[in-house]
Amino acid sequence: MSAGEITEAVRLHKVKRPGGVFWFDLHQIEQNSDGTWLRGPVGSPWGAPHDCGVLSVPVVVLLKVGRPWAAWWVGDPADQRLEIDVCLPPEVTEAGWRYVDLELDPVLHERDERVEIEDWDEYEEAYGNGWMTTDDATLARTTAERCAEVLRHGAEPWLSRGWQLLRQSR
């Protein structure tokens, strides 16, 4: 498959505990040593336990089996950003991909290069209510801190590749 080539739909399942399963119909566009790259152009379908719709902005997603995060480049004109979903390592499924969200999200806001870790409240609630184990909570915290540092330094080649693929998806 060549870079940017659109393939048939791949369903990405994002499990939020206890919120249920969210899904996104995306397209695999590339696979390399960094992982599997998915694209969701404007109009791509998504669903949640109590809602559904289509993407209003383009996204590019990078996943890799065994790595406890999924990166989302979000082409929102008001706040173009890279969000990293800290998660249990993604798994390939018959329909595409699946991961369990561990709530913490390191985010790089491209406009001002600000990096923050979002959703500490959701993390505390999930851990406090027993929706994630102590091991999962530790994985979430350490992975979020490590990913935030990667975003601050900006040296990893996959960071610029994601922005490039996002620009191509417009």
Describe the function of each predicted region:
Residues P77-G130:
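Conserved, surface-exposed functional patches that form binding/active-site neighborhoods
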Residues T143-R170:
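Cysteine/selenocysteine-centered motifs that mediate thiol-based redox chemistry or coordinate metal-sulfur cofactors
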Residues G47-W97:
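The feature represents the first ordered module of a protein
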Residues V92, D136-T138, A155, L159-S160:
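Juxtamembrane/interface motifs at transmembrane-helix termini
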Residues D121-A148:
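Short, surface-exposed, low-complexity cationic segments
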Residues R39-G40, W72, D85, E118:
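Beta-strand residues in well-ordered beta-sheet regions across diverse protein folds
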Residues L26-Q28, V59-V60, E103-V107:
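Hydrophobic/aromatic beta-strand elements that line small-molecule binding cavities or substrate pockets
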